[in-house]
Amino acid sequence: MNDRMVWIDCEMTGLSLSDDALIEVAALVTDSELNILGEGVDIVIRPPERALETMPEVVREMHTASGLLAELDGGTTLADAEAQVLAYVREHVKEPGKAPLCGNSVGTDRGFLLRDMATLEGYLHYRIVDVSSIKELARRWYPRAYFNSPEKNGNHRALADIRESIAELRYYREAVFVPQPGPDSDTARAIAAKHVVSAG
């Protein structure tokens, strides 16, 4: 069984796949216990000038405050950034198509990866582990856990955001998931039988 989880966070000039540019990508790989493997990578990408010119003001302010905007002139190419991330991921995930993409609201990140880093995106499993989904369920089913979740210091830098996502999943695992080893097989089967949806 492949227990690896690939955590990726992207910073962009906006959220539009047709207009905006990927300007930072970071990755960490964990095992199933959420232990980080290796040092990870965090890479700044130099965007096309047009993407900077059309960047929404709120995004410009965010990337100025985080220091990312000042680093863009020294950024690398998309191809080089993809090669660096892929090298790190392959070091810890030997088989393509096995490890899911993980993070917070990773659907947007996956869209930019598919557009700009298709080889990397294709190396990942099609499934995702989205911590924001767990957070939304906790808000509805375990509000005390939701409202007491770890405070985020989010500076909107990719690697820091990943570390916070991993910490958040560790918290929800401890606060809302059934303690290990979970139910025995008979109990699990009995629970499953209550939730079978009939065909037709």
From Swiss-Prot:
- Transport: present as a keyword of the record? no
Q: Where in or outside the cell?
A: Cytoplasm
- Where do the Exonuclease domain residues begin and end? 5-169
Keywords for the protein's UniProt record, in alphabetical order: Cytoplasm, Exonuclease, Hydrolase, Nuclease
- List the record's Gene Ontology CC terms alphabetically: cytoplasm
InterPro entries, alphabetized: Exonuclease_RNaseT/DNA_pol3 (IPR013520), Oligoribonuclease (IPR022894), RNaseH-like_sf (IPR012337), RNaseH_sf (IPR036397)
Give the superkingdom in one word.
Bacteria
Q: What is its main location?
A: cytoplasm
Q: Pfam families given for it?
A: RNase_T
EC number(s)?
Answer: 3.1.15.-
Which GO MF term does the entry hold, naming one?
Answer: nucleic acid binding
Record-annotated active site = Y126
Q: Which family does it belong to?
A: Belongs to the oligoribonuclease family.
PANTHER family the UniProt entry points to: OLIGORIBONUCLEASE, MITOCHONDRIAL (PTHR11046:SF0)
The task this protein performs is described as: 3'-to-5' exoribonuclease specific for small oligoribonucleotides.
Name the chain's protein: Oligoribonuclease
Which species is listed as the source?
Streptomyces coelicolor (strain ATCC BAA-471 / A3(2) / M145)
